[in-house]
């Protein structure tokens, strides 16, 4: 195999694909800052239509629906990933669904002019559907066009796009920018602009070479794309690996969601995929970001919104750090370090929130614990679950696996957003102990069950789960579940 390079074509394709991740992050964070202003809009609109003052219960219910409907759309979208990528390809699927982003953005952007609560809620549902699809398309596309030796580092770009989107939403939501009574519809409708930019650029990006060869049997086209993306003429080994995988697929029936759980070959990797997604959402990170302003306020910070933005900056910085670490330390090791660090920080958050009224300096301990909590999240549980799912499965079951994993992520996201306020009300500062328990469970699971995939081809990983070639694995590098994450990789890549 020739030396694989990081080419301009590869960076361009990765950057354009990551716009979908940015959209997910932006639309996740954009609804938080203008909460009071949007509630005033709901109140005024309902009063104008019914000529009666709406009850507090109705207003709260509509606000909660406006927030939660995004996750409902995400669940539906993530479960529909396979319907698109198997028929239209990875790139074309990303291109097509931008219509949803434009439609959702228009509905939200014009809801105030139309004085329509329904347009706001429908827009959030549609944009959630779009983001749910993106959470499947983007990591799948990135994983399939990246060189094996850099697949983990480039896989982290998906999470980097998400956290940059959240940070931009937080900044744009400031009152000095678009978080005002007049401009909040533009804040929500801004999602149209990245959708248009991505739509204009995607035709210049290549289709996934794995999709072209394995699904459409276009070997020459796939070979040409690999040579252009990786900057080497010698891609024969990669082409042969894809052809072998294609031959295996031809002997198997199409893999459905149910088949993932019925087949012994797929059962372990799909359980690992689901648990990794749950480890991301049940770690407490969304509880921290959804309610960070209130947490900082409780900790005694005078301008909590800026402290929340500070947490977003830390989020972004450590995602970049993870990008450089993931191919050196390995996925499994970083995930365990992240989970362990978050568990310690969640205990510190609980203690500092309990004692801040007695000791003023505990407020600073709380803020520090939150920032370090976010940093550990981006070292492991933030980026790794998204791209490792694509690594655990071959071409056939990958779309169904991405759908199940994505739906697990969105469902747990929805449940945390729904249940955390009540849990915080009844448990107070002790609420983060719940997340500590989850973090410890996921840490133990990762130690015993999650394989190290660094430097492994898709075929090697799949065969290890199928139980094939175990003798060779023991002789050369040990069983996959026991792989040392610090082993040197075989492939090389240069910039």
UniProtKB/Swiss-Prot annotation:
Reaction(s) catalysed (UniProt annotation): D-glucose(out) = D-glucose(in); D-galactose(in) = D-galactose(out)
Bilayer-spanning residue ranges: 11-32, 65-85, 91-111, 119-142, 154-174, 184-204, 270-290, 305-325, 332-352, 364-389, 400-420, 430-450
Glycosylated residues in this chain: 43
Gene Ontology cellular component terms for the protein in this record: cell projection; membrane; perikaryon; plasma membrane
Subcellular location: Cell membrane; Perikaryon; Cell projection
A GO molecular-function descriptor: D-glucose binding
Extracellular side stretches: 33-64, 112-118, 175-183, 291-304, 353-363, 421-429
Activity regulation details: Deoxyglucose transport is inhibited by D-glucose, D-galactose and maltose. Galactose transport is inhibited by D-glucose and maltose.
Residues reported in the UniProt entry to bind D-glucose: 159, 280-281, 286, 315, 378, 386
Entries under Pfam families matching the protein: Sugar_tr
Chief location bin: membrane
Annotated InterPro entries: Glc_transpt_3, GLUT, MFS_dom, MFS_sugar_transport-like, MFS_trans_sf, Sugar/inositol_transpt, Sugar_transporter_CS
Phosphoserine modification, residue list: 485
Gene Ontology biological process terms from the UniProt entry: D-glucose import; D-glucose transmembrane transport; dehydroascorbic acid transport; galactose transmembrane transport
Keywords: Cell membrane, Cell projection, Glycoprotein, Membrane, Phosphoprotein, Sugar transport, Transmembrane, Transmembrane helix, Transport
Region (Important for selectivity against fructose): 277-279
Residues with the Phosphothreonine modification: 232, 492
The protein's assembly and partners: Interacts with SMIM43; the interaction may promote SLC2A3-mediated glucose transport to meet the energy needs of mesendoderm differentiation.
Family: Belongs to the major facilitator superfamily. Sugar transporter (TC 2.A.1.1) family. Glucose transporter subfamily.
Function comment: Facilitative glucose transporter. Can also mediate the uptake of various other monosaccharides across the cell membrane. Mediates the uptake of glucose, 2-deoxyglucose, galactose, mannose, xylose and fucose, and probably also dehydroascorbate. Does not mediate fructose transport. Required for mesendoderm differentiation.
Domain notes: Transport is mediated via a series of conformation changes, switching between a conformation where the substrate-binding cavity is accessible from the outside, and a another conformation where it is accessible from the cytoplasm.
Name the record gives this protein: Solute carrier family 2, facilitated glucose transporter member 3
Species this chain originates from: Canis lupus familiaris (Dog)
Gene expressing this chain: SLC2A3
């Amino acid at each position: 195999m020739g030396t694989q390079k990081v080419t301009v074509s590869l960076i361009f394709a990765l950057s354009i694909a990551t716009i979908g991740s940015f959209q997910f992050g932006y639309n996740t964070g954009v609804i938080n800052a203008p909460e009071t202003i949007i509630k005033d809009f709901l109140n005024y609109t309902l009063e104008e239509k019914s000529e009666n003052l709406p009850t507090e219960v109705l207003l709260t219910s509509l606000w909660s629906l406006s927030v939660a409907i995004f996750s409902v759309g995400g669940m539906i979208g993530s479960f529909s990933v396979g319907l698109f990528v198997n028929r239209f390809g990875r790139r074309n699927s990303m291109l097509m669904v931008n219509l949803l982003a434009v439609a959702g953005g228009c509905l939200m952007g014009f809801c105030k002019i139309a004085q329509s609560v329904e347009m706001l809620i429908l827009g959030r549902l549609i944009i959630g559907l779009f983001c749910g699809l993106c959470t499947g398309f983007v990591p799948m596309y990135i994983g399939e066009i990246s060189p094996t030796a850099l697949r983990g580092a480039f896989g982290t770009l998906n999470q980097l796009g998400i956290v940059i989107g959240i940070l931009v939403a937080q900044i744009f939501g400031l009152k000095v920018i678009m978080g005002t009574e007049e401009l909040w519809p533009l804040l929500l409708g801004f999602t149209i602009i990245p959708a248009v930019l991505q739509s204009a650029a995607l035709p210049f990006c290549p289709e996934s070479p794995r999709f072209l060869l394995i699904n459409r049997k276009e070997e020459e086209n796939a070979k040409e794309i690999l040579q252009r993306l990786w900057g080497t003429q010698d891609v024969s080994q990669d082409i042969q690996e894809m052809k072998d995988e294609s031959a295996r697929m031809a002997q198997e029936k199409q893999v459905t969601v149910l088949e993932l759980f019925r087949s012994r070959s797929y059962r372990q990797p799909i359980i690992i995929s689901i648990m990794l997604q749950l480890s991301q959402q049940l770690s407490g990170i969304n509880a921290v970001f959804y309610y960070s302003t209130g947490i900082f306020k409780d900790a005694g910070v005078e301008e909590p919104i800026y402290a929340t933005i500070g947490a977003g900056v830390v989020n972004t910085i450590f995602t970049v750090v993870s990008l450089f670490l993931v191919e050196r330390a390995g996925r499994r090791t970083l995930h365990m370090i992240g989970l362990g660090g978050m568990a310690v920080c969640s205990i510190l958050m609980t203690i500092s929130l309990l004692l801040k009224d007695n000791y003023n300096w505990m407020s600073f301990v709380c803020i520090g614990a939150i920032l370090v909590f976010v940093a550990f999240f981006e070292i492991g549980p933030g980026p790794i679950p998204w791209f490792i799912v694509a690594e655990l499965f071959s071409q056939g079951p990958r779309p169904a696996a991405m759908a199940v994993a994505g739906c697990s992520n969105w469902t747990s996201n929805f449940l945390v957003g729904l249940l955390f306020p009540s849990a915080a009300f009844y448990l107070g500062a002790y609420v983060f102990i719940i997340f500590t328990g989850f973090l410890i469970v996921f840490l133990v699971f990762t130690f015993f069950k999650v394989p190290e995939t660094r430097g492994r081809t898709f075929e090697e990983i799949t065969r290890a789960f199928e139980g094939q070639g175990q003798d060779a694995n023991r002789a050369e590098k040990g069983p996959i579940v026991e792989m040392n994450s610090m082993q040197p990789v075989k492939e090389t890549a240069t910039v």
